[in-house]
Amino acid sequence: ATMAALSGHPALKAVSPQAPILDWFKGDDVHHNGALMLMDIYSFATYMFKDHDNPVTEDHGLPSPIGPDAYEWFQNKTPLSLTLALPDTLQFWNEILQHPDYDEYWVERSIEQHLHDIRPAILVVGGAYDTDDCYGALNTYKLIRKNSPETDLHFVYGSWSHGGWHDAGYEGLGTRKFGTDLSAYFMKNIEFPFFRFYLEGKGRRPEPVYAFASGSDQWQKTDVWPSDELDYKTIYLSSDGGLSFTASEDAESFASYVSDPASPVPFMADASSRDKTYMVENQ
């Protein structure tokens, strides 16, 4: 959707980049803050990176080779053995391994440098619990607002996992529930009116920003995100394992723990795969 918006085609009036990929090294899909999302991208490779002819008439995905204990399975693999477990047609996987640092390969594939002079109205949609492309949504909005100020820009940020905004049954993540109408409200009261206004000229101009406050489970409307009305607080770690809004007066306080990769502290009940609830599973 972002690439379509950049085309400048005169017939294109409104575009909604939803969980848009912005930079594959800084924060979307392949890497998060430069760290390779190994389990995610390796699993993804088995069904998304495979070369195929067009048009596609059947699912060409491959069964995941990851064993029942994913942590142990990856520990016993080298980059070469990981590659050999996949067909040699998976060119993108090989290129990921060939470019472990932020070099020209990743810069050329980044959308950041192109987000300017955007003509159609834009509705960027992102999820606070999107394990794949949270970076892309936040920074696509931020960069369009900065570099393309004439664009009619709108932003929606909800307590969704990846793609949850179009799941009518989405209630929350794990045991944390946000209400049964979170996605239904978005589709009925935000997304549909956006396209109706810009494509048909009907209804009211949409609000610039809709943000779902997970503490109160309510939608909030504001002119920009982050809102100028936010009250920022500094939270301090305390030696008793708690949190405080006041700094400790004990300059010598500390907390210690042992981190042993060979015996990790578990945070997922099921180690055979990665699902969307891993972001809250240790809470």
Regions found by a protein language model. Name each.
Residues 7-13, 132, 143-154, 197-202:
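Secondary-structure transition/capping motifs at alpha-helix termini
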Residues 64-68, 73-78, 165, 172-283:
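C-terminal, loop-rich substrate-recognition/catalytic regions characterized by aromatic stacking residues
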Residues 145-170:
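Catalytic histidine neighborhood in serine/cysteine hydrolases
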Residues 131-138:
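Conserved alpha/beta-hydrolase "acid-adjacent" motif
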Residues 16-19, 156-159, 238:
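Alpha/beta-hydrolase-fold catalytic nucleophile elbow
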Residues 1-5:
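Short helix immediately C-terminal to the catalytic nucleophile in hydrolase catalytic domains
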Residues 118, 124-126:
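Short beta-strand/loop motif that positions the catalytic acidic residue
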Residues 6-8, 13-117:
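Accessory cap/linker subdomain of secreted extracellular hydrolases
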